[in-house]
Structure formats: structure tokens, C-alpha cells
């Protein structure tokens, strides 16, 4: 049956042309497998390997292993030939083809591996480095702004603690320190940022022990700011017992704020400065530079982070202490007018020493009529007092005296 025996083999491997790039010194196995028609009148199949179209001699760089399996009905035989190639020189590279009964299907092409391309890796590394640099730049530029936003949004509120001042400022009684405190520190913190300061140029810790006045004043303030100038450091307790004094201050107030100056960095031999740098985790150490005078400098942002969170009031709601009480005392009303010296001016703080800031109009109260100067103080004293509604007023004890801030104001 020569027609049956002439049927072309069915190649299983390679199913298509393959390109391999083995490195020098490595080895690779090329597998050629096919189903071949078998029969009593068919010759035994044989596999022949070709390299670049020429018969390949076995030996040297090559090794050959052949296997065959016959079907149960003896109609086909599975022929497999595995060519082992040792890539020891560049002469081994080329196109390898297996041929069965002078019929070949696909080939293996061995190519020399070119130099490894590191372009992708270099580009990826540069992108990662650029991203890290950008993140570091954003952290340096925006860190304080993000911290300020977080403090304003989620910081601890320290309003209803009974304290009158946001910070106690201790400084030396010398012209330079007075100018710094009164013309730079106080205007920036009080007028621009709404804090209330208590200024004191007396010795903070005479004989390294707090005085009675200091204890009282610190109890009225939420923070302690020390202007650590050269004149301040010249005090006796700063040179001889600063460690003991610092321990006393840490007992009296939370995380005191020390303002140092750039000129002191050149001479860090003072024991107080060395001690503060060693205990940065217990205190807030700020550095004043020549460029810190601008309102947008990082110095003021760091000071604001160290000070309590400020609560912004809505002026339309007025004083939260009296907004629900309709507290209009008839003793202050003379013939439907407000006496001189008690005009309801919403822009003037009626309690400048207190902690409520500028009060707005009382909730539900009509605006005060424009004041006329026709009534003098002497005439006011001689006028009759309108007491017609005294009996209808509630004079019971006030229960909301210390509820200065409602939840809506937070």
C-alpha cells in the first residue's frame, strides 16, 4: 500500500517556527515529535536534523535521543527526536530543522543573545526617583499648611477651660526684647491671628523657683512662650540652674515654647541651649531668622501649631451666653434710649480682658437706633428709669453662665 505509506507526517512539535536566544555556555534541547503512518508495507520512519539546510553531524556540540511508540492497532507510530545543543561557541547559532521522510514542517532558530537592554529599568528608576523627589518637595513646602489645616479641623478645643489668655510671654526687660515682643510678636499673634497674650518682663524663675505671681499668671494662660535672647540667658538661673528651672516649668505648663535667635547658633556653648536641644521632645524650640518677620514665614506657622486651636465665631449669633435669654436690662434703658457710654456697638469688644473676642448683636434683638447727642450725661442721670416690666422678669440664678460656646460654634 504505497499510497498509505506516502501520507505526510503529522508534526506535533515544533508546531510553528521558534526563535531561541541561548547565552554562550548554556545548553538547549530541541524536540521534534510527529505521528507517522505505520504498516507492514511501510518503511520504518527516521528523523534527520538539518542545520542551515545541511545535514547535521552528531557529535561535538550535539547529542541525539530518539523514541518511538506504536498505536495498539499498528496504524501509526509516534516518533520523537530530542537534539541537545551545547552552545559553546558562536558557530552553533543557526536554523535547525527536523525532517521525517524528507518532509519538514517548522524550524528552531538559535540566535545569539544581544546585550541586555537596561533602558526600561533605567527609566523606571528615574521615574521612581522623580516621584520621591516630588513627594519630598511637597512635604517640605506643604507640611506646615497641612498640619495647620488638620489642627483647625480636628484639633483639641481649649476654650472652656477657664483660662483668660492663650499664652504667657516671658522676656527680658531690655530694649531689643521689648521691641521684638511689642512690635513683632504681639501684633502678629493678637491682631493677625486672634490670640490673646499676657506679657511679663520680670524674671521668670528668680532663684530657680516660681514666684506666687508666676503661679497665678501661668494658671490663667494656656501656653508659655519664652523669648530666649542673649539678655534672657544672662540671668543667673539660666546659667547655673537651668535644668532645675526647666523641670519646674514642665510641671507648671504643657510643652513650653522657647524662641531662640539665629545668632545664637554660632555659639552653642550656653548650657541652656544645649539642654533644650537635648530635650526637644519635651519643649517646642523655634528659631527666629531675619526672614521670619514676614507674616507668611514658617516661623509663624510653627508658633500657631504650638498654640491652642482658635475657634471662629459666627458674629450673627451674638454672645452665646445671652443669646437665648433676651437679656435686655430695663435698668440700662432711659425713656427708650441707651445712655451715653453704653451704646450697643457690635464692633467694640465689651469685655476686652475676657476670652470671647468681639461680640456681635444679641440673637433676636433689633438693631440699636442711631445715637443722637441731644441727651447729655447730666440729663441722663436726672431722667426717670422705666421700671414698668420689672415684675415680669426672671431673676432666678443663671445656670448657663459658663456655657460660653455652643456646639454649633465649634
From Swiss-Prot:
Quaternary organization: Interacts with IL1R1, IRAK1, TLR4, TLR5, TLR9 and TRAF6. Upon IL-1 stimulation found in a complex at least composed of IL1R1, SIGIRR, MYD88, IRAK1 and TRAF6. Upon stimulation with LPC found in a complex at least composed of TLR4, SIG1IR, MYD88, IRAK1 and TRAF6. Interacts with PALM3.
A GO term from the CC aspect: cell surface
Family: Belongs to the interleukin-1 receptor family.
UniProt cross-references to PANTHER family, sorted A to Z: INTERLEUKIN-1 RECEPTOR FAMILY MEMBER, SINGLE IG IL-1-RELATED RECEPTOR
Induction: Down-regulated during inflammation by inhibition of an SP1-mediated pathway.
Function text: Acts as a negative regulator of the Toll-like and IL-1R receptor signaling pathways. Attenuates the recruitment of receptor-proximal signaling components to the TLR4 receptor, probably through an TIR-TIR domain interaction with TLR4. Through its extracellular domain interferes with the heterodimerization of Il1R1 and IL1RAP.
GO biological process: acute-phase response; cell surface receptor signaling pathway; negative regulation of chemokine production; negative regulation of cytokine-mediated signaling pathway; negative regulation of interleukin-1-mediated signaling pathway; negative regulation of lipopolysaccharide-mediated signaling pathway; negative regulation of Toll signaling pathway
Tissue-wise expression: Mainly expressed in epithelial tissues such as kidney, lung and gut.
Disulfide bonds: 32-98
Protein name: Single Ig IL-1-related receptor
Cell compartment(s), UniProt: Membrane
Protein source organism: Homo sapiens
Glycosylation sites (chain numbering): 31, 73, 86, 102
Organism taxonomic ancestry: Eukaryota, Metazoa, Chordata, Craniata, Vertebrata
